[in-house]
Amino acid sequence: MDRILTVEQMTFCEHEAEKYGVSLAQLMDNAAAQLAEVIASNSSASSKIVLLIGKGNNGGDGLVAANLLAEQGLKPAVVLCCGEPDTDLSSAAYARLDKSVQVLKAENVLDFIEGADVLVDCIFGTGFHGSLRENILPVFRACEKCEGMKIACDLPSGVNARNGQADKLSFKADVTVTFHRGKLGLYLQPAVDFCGEILVKDIGIDERCENTLYPVITPFDVVKARAALPFRPADGHKGTFGKVVSVAGSESYIGAAGLSAMAAMRTGVGLFELCTAKSVVNSLSAGMYECTYSAMKTDKDGFMVAENAETILKKCEKASCLLIGCGLGHTAQTEKLVAELIENAEIPIVLDADGINSLCPNIDVLLKKKSTVILTPHPAELARLCGVTVGEVMSDRLGSAYRLSEKYGVTVLAKSADTFAVDGGKVYLCTEGTTTLAKGGSGDMLAGIVSSYVAQGCDALDAAALGSFTLGSTALLAGYKRSERGIIARDVIDALPRFLYDLENAD
């Protein structure tokens, strides 16, 4: 798949295309031709073809497509779902509608919609947001009952093209015909469940229209993942493959430190040193022999204190990545510890969980960093980092991560069912999310994997995206022919070597 565009980027391209001799009217004609071709390929002379038409330019695409279908001898009918078209282009298309095309109003034809052989959604375009209005819900309920082929024009109505949010009654397409580039929201949950197969069709927009558009969003797929895997020379030794120093764990949160360590070691890092509370050392060292341990000073509740910073920074001199936060806890002392490590560490830092929470009160310390910093927030942590609500983040998760990355010069791995790896103007979209990972410990594994890839030499953006791809794909593998309900973090860790073998040997 090529580049993905935001709604704003696509709108810019449509208007910029005029500089290269393609008008908005011509773009509508080109889109309609592509839509009509897909409709015709799924129809026969006897097919009952019903196009659901909105008032805007999405409806205009459908009206022009109806004319083209009529020219081919097919018998399309159009249903005006929101009244007559009201944009310049859609009104002009309506005025040119062939007299052989049957025109109906939605309120009288719900049974007609249900009985369509090919049902085409041209109601709402990329400007849709919020919920479907009550007065149009009967149309969408009729669409639900239709057993014919369902095709969406540009995106299914009811889907938000900016963030992937979707009304529960959104048009559920078998095929979505989208134009020039895929729109971001089509590839995000829950919208992806309404899109069916996504066909990206050329409508004559010159790629030079995109030259000034940032961020550049591309999917992170198996080809990119294999290319990003750190090279392992045959004569390599443990020092060749890097060392992670991890500041993690506390008396209250022992498991997080162990899960992140095991995930890192299962993904190829040569050495892993865990700097943690003595109680964590005593617990984990009895069964996890592969890493080394350093007991740190703690307060009376078993959380690490800031005076450990000097010791940890000394250890960083012989390491290639510093991981901070898994099970660390959040106190005034961890805030000081995290700030001092960020300000003084000269190796790349991966900051997760309570590392992020401890950073938030002193976030401007990121401006004093001496090395690369990767933040791995889930939506609530991203909201804290940005000083906004979770709702504001979820309405524009990419924008939130992008602005954070730009402001502080950091790499942001914005976790969710679909994950964005953001580094300045470059964004990877990772879509391997699964409910297998909707359990405690998943974030700890991800942080460990990302730190492992950084320690082995990956740049920050590749390490973040590859980490997300690795965890999601391994979780899918661990859950193969097993219930996602019953998979736990250790099952995923145990499956990592198999996933990496498959990736290394992928065609």
Model-derived features: positions:
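Small/polar-residue-rich loop-to-helix segments that shape phosphate-bearing ligand pockets
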Residues: 94, 117-124, 317-326
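Nucleotide and nucleotide-moiety/phosphate-recognizing core
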Residues: 36-122, 131-153, 345, 403
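Short beta-alpha junction loops
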Residues: 82-85, 156-157, 279, 355
